[in-house]
Design a protein with these regions (language model features):
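Internal/C-terminal transmembrane anchor helices
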Residues: 80-110
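Perimembrane helix-loop junctions in membrane proteins
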Residues: 24-31, 79-83, 109, 113
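Hydrophobic membrane-targeting signal helices
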Residues: 18-22, 77, 103-104, 108, ...
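Membrane-bilayer interface helices and TM-boundary transition segments
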Residues: 107-119, 133
Length: 315
C-alpha cells in the first residue's frame, strides 16, 4: 500500500492542505484565495483517495492513524514554537484522539469482521471480533517480525492472519505447529499420529450457498440443501464445535508435514473453507497479527440491523 501512487498522492495532498491552513492561520488575512476557501473540500477528497487506496490494497488503517499522529504532532510543535494559540488548540484536538486510537488499535485491540461462513457454526458471516494484537508479539504492521514480545500461536487458537497469496485478512482455527505431521482420514484429523478428540453432537438439515469456479475463472453461486454433522472438538486448551457436510469432500487420506516457522490452519466449517488444506497453504509465523478473543457484535448486511445477542468470549 505504501508504494501505491494514489496513497502517496493523498498523503502529499493532505499534508499540503495542512500547510496551507497553517500559513493562512499565521497570516490572519481576510483575503481568501481558491485553496483557502475550499481547503475542507480538497482535504476531504484527498482523504477519500486515501481510504480508497486502503480498500483496494487491503491496507491497514493503523498506517493512516500513524501518519495522522505524526502530522498533528509536527503541527502542534510548530504552533508552540511560533506561539500561535489557534494552531496549538486545533492540532492538540486532533493529535490526542488520533494518537490514542493508533496506540489502542496497533498494540492492543483491533476490530475485525468475518467476511464468510468458514468458521460456522461457532462464528458466522458478519460477526465483529476483537483481535488481541499483542497475543503473538508487538509490531506496527499486521505482518512482519515482532519487535518486543514474541509469543507463538497455540493449538485451537482462533487466529487472524494475512495469507501469503492474498493481502486480505483471514480468520481460522490453528491446527498444526512447525514440524507437526497433519493427517486427515474420513474427516478425522490426526496430529503426529494422534487423533484430535471429538464427540458427535447432532445432525442437521440446512441450506448452504456453494461457490463454483469454471474453466474461465468465472465464479458462480448455488443454494443447496445438505445434511451436516456437528462435533465437539477439543484441541489444546480449546473446545469448540465443527461442522462436516455429509457426502462432501470424500477423498483419500491426506497428509502434510508442516515446515519450520509455518503453521497449519482450518475453518471450523470443514467442508466449506479455504484453508491450509486448499488454497491458503502453510501460514508463515510472521503473517499472524492477532488472536480473536471476543465477539462484540453481529452485522450481517448493510441494510440489516446489528444485534448483540451472541456477544461473548470466543472458544
Amino acid at each position: 500500500m505504501l508504494s501505491d501512487p494514489i496513497f502517496i498522492l493523498s498523503v502529499i495532498g493532505m499534508s499540503s492542505c495542512v500547510i496551507f491552513w497553517m500559513k493562512d492561520t499565521i497570516k490572519s488575512s481576510e483575503e481568501e484565495n481558491f485553496i483557502t476557501r475550499n481547503i475542507s473540500t480538497v482535504a476531504t477528497l484527498f482523504g477519500l483517495m486515501m481510504l480508497y487506496s486502503i480498500f483496494i490494497n487491503a491496507g491497514d488503517l493503523g498506517i493512516i492513524l500513524f501518519i495522522g499522529s505524526i502530522i498533528a504532532f509536527l503541527v502542534l510543535i510548530v504552533g508552540i514554537v511560533i506561539g500561535n494559540p489557534i494552531i496549538i488548540q486545533t492540532s492538540r484536538g486532533y493529535f490526542i484522539p488520533i494518537f490514542l486510537i493508533f496506540v489502542l488499535r496497533t498494540f492492543i485491540y483491533e476490530p475485525y469482521q468475518i467476511p464468510s461462513g468458514s468458521m460456522l457454526p461457532g462464528l458466522q458471516k458478519g460477526d465483529f471480533l476483537v483481535v488481541n494484537k499483542n497475543s503473538y508479539g508487538l509490531k506496527v504492521n499486521r505482518t512482519g517480525v515482532s519487535s518486543i514480545i514474541k509469543n507463538d500461536p497455540e493449538y485451537g487458537d482462533v487466529v487472524v492472519f494475512i495469507p501469503p497469496h492474498n493481502p486480505v485478512p483471514y480468520v481460522k482455527r490453528l491446527i498444526g505447529k512447525p514440524g507437526d505431521s497433519v493427517r486427515i482420514i474420513n474427516k478425522q484429523i490426526f496430529i503426529n499420529g494422534k487423533a484430535i478428540s471429538r464427540e458427535f453432537v447432532k445432525t442437521e438439515k440446512i441450506t448452504i450457498t456453494k461457490r463454483y469456479r469454471d474453466s474461465l475463472g468465472t465464479i458462480s453461486t448455488r443454494d443447496m440443501d445438505v445434511v451436516v454433522d456437528l462435533y465437539f472438538e477439543e484441541h489444546g486448551s480449546k473446545k469448540y464445535i465443527t461442522r462436516n457436510i455429509r457426502g462432501e469432500n470424500i477423498q483419500y487420506p491426506s497428509e502434510w508435514t508442516i515446515p519450520s516457522n509455518h503453521y497449519f490452519v482450518m475453518g471450523d466449517n470443514r467442508d466449506n473453507s479455504n484453508d491450509s488444506t486448499k488454497d491458503v497453504g502453510f501460514v508463515p509465523r510472521d503473517n499472524f497479527f492477532g488472536k480473536a478473543d471476543y465477539l462484540f457484535m453481529t452485522w450481517e448486511c448493510w441494510t440489516c440491523m446489528p444485534y448483540f445477542s451472541r456477544v461473548g468470549k470466543i472458544n
